[in-house]
Amino acid sequence: MNAPAPKPGLVIVDKPAGMTSHDVVSKLRRAFSTRKVGHAGTLDPMATGVLVVGIERGTRFLAHMVASTKAYDATIRLGAATSTDDAEGEVISTTDASGLDHSTILAEIVNLTGDIMQKPTKVSAIKIDGKRAHERVRDGEEVDIPARPVTVSVFDVLDYHVDGEFYDLDVRVHCSSGTYIRALARDLGNALQVGGHLTALRRTEVGPFTLNDATPLSKLQENPELSLNLDQALTRSYPVLDITEDEGVDLSMGKWLEPRGLKGVHAAVTPSGKAVALIEEKGKRLATVFVAHPNTL
């Protein structure tokens, strides 16, 4: 007899350093005994912190988290530029940054805050004509990724110190999805004409999920448990619309409801607490965006 499929939902992982996001997925596939595992929002190997992983039908919910805001704690080293904009790459230039004026640094940080155009780092997972940018760079190709709009809502300096010819900044960043913290380090260094790169990165938040929700990967391998079932995931991520049990049955079958003047996506929740679906008004219909509990009978 085949083992029953694991329950669907999300696992909030505290990713360790030295491992790709795909490595985490591979280990959780083994731990949960299912191929249906995926992640939202890639973390670089050197980065640690919040990685949201979907299990079973939870993988389909991940597509509705792509636009989530994110928060990071990071360390930026001014005085050296690298090929990858982080400590994993080769140093390509150095300039003594020990004499930088702190007020000048803060002024340039202001210029990198708000709605900005950011050129993603070349060594990234962005696809160019079907091939990831980091693969093209590895194969010796010249890569030029166009700048794209991102929002940096918080870029605060928590601490700073001079280390020889380098000027290190401990920073906290809140930003839109698609923002590269490595690129912020690079651009800050370029603006100050000394070069810059990232030496540490820890993601502290993805949408509504924080480090308080996260479990170390090693513990999940020993005891594979969901962090949130689908009902909890939907209601943590979206405002709730209370519906009747009958309406829940209709939505579970892909039917639509009469419009109610809603703005944006809501989680439709029955009196029994089941988050049946994500719904959104489209014209004269209140239609499903994602069905968490489909009724295929």
UniProtKB/Swiss-Prot annotation:
Pfam families, sorted: TruB_C, TruB_C_2, TruB_N
EC assignment: 5.4.99.25
Residue numbers annotated as active site: 44
GO biological processes: mRNA pseudouridine synthesis; tRNA pseudouridine synthesis
Disulfide bonds: none
Reaction(s) catalysed by this chain's protein: uridine(55) in tRNA = pseudouridine(55) in tRNA
One GO MF term attached to the UniProt entry: tRNA pseudouridine(55) synthase activity
Keyword Secreted (UniProt): no
Keywords of this entry: Isomerase, tRNA processing
Domain of life: Bacteria
Top class in the EC scheme: isomerase
Family label: Belongs to the pseudouridine synthase TruB family. Type 1 subfamily.
NCBIfam families assigned to the protein according to its UniProt record, in alphabetical order: TruB
Protein's job: Responsible for synthesis of pseudouridine from uracil-55 in the psi GC loop of transfer RNAs.
Protein name as it appears in the record: tRNA pseudouridine synthase B
Organism of derivation: Corynebacterium glutamicum (strain ATCC 13032 / DSM 20300 / JCM 1318 / BCRC 11384 / CCUG 27702 / LMG 3730 / NBRC 12168 / NCIMB 10025 / NRRL B-2784 / 534)
Upper lineage: Bacteria, Bacillati, Actinomycetota, Actinomycetes, Mycobacteriales
